[in-house]
Every structure is written in structure tokens, then in C-alpha cells.
């Protein structure tokens, strides 16, 4: 079981954009308040502008939204990437990194010979945070 006195590594992927801001706040606050110092969290988020329906920078996102809507799935929460670090810090966690598409490709999707094996959408970020 979960022991809040022991360091924990949380992987919270594919969730934040499907729940409310209050749900995100509650989860981040719970982790900050009930986890041992040094515990870590990795989660992804979608840009608030895209969730709000602004597809001007990422036109293909419109198709993704239509497909998800067809399957009765709706994106409801996003974070402004310019405020990503502040958003997480305000909820009691310390950001280690908040990376976008290019850094994701460099770190995780480039083989040793330089071949890129995937291109994530530009409107997602991955955050790595720690409990101070």
C-alpha cells in the first residue's frame, strides 16, 4: 500500500486534460501534502489555448478534437505553457523540467544514429516535479 513516509514516483499521464481544474488542483495538492520529501511526479498537459478551441498555431488539433468528440471524449483542462512552472509551484511542488515537443524528441524519440522515431504534437508538455 501507499506509505506517505516513503518516497513515491507518480506517473500521471493522459489524465489532466480530461478532468477539471479542481481535479488537477486536488491531485497536485494531495501529492504535495501527503508525499515524502523527494517524491517525484511526471505528468503531461495540453495547452490551454488549444483546449479552449484556438487551433491557429496547431490546425491539425481540430481533427483530434473532432475524433475525440465522436467518441464522447472531451478535453476540458489545459495549462498555459508560459505559466506551467508557476502553476505547479503554486500547488506545492518544485518543477524539475517542463519540456515541449523538441525536447521530447531529443530525449526520448531519437535513436543513437540520430533517427527520429516519433513526433509528438506541439501542444503537449511533460512536467517532472518533486515534493520539496
What are these regions (language model features)?
Residues 1-132:
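Alpha-helical subdomain
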Amino acid at each position: 500500500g501507499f506509505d506517505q513516509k516513503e518516497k513515491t514516483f507518480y506517473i500521471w499521464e493522459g489524465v489532466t486534460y480530461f478532468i477539471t481544474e479542481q481535479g488537477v488542483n486536488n491531485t497536485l495538492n494531495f501529492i504535495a501534502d501527503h508525499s515524502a520529501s523527494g517524491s517525484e511526479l511526471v505528468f503531461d498537459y495540453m495547452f490551454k489555448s488549444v483546449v479552449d478551441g484556438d487551433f491557429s498555431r496547431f490546425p491539425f488539433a481540430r481533427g483530434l478534437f473532432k475524433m475525440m468528440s465522436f467518441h464522447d471524449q472531451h478535453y476540458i483542462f489545459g495549462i498555459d505553457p508560459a505559466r506551467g512552472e508557476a502553476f505547479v509551484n503554486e500547488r506545492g511542488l518544485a518543477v524539475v523540467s517542463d519540456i515541449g515537443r523538441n525536447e521530447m524528441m531529443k530525449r526520448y524519440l531519437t535513436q543513437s544514429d540520430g533517427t527520429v522515431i516519433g513526433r509528438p504534437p506541439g501542444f503537449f508538455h511533460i512536467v517532472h516535479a518533486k515534493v520539496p
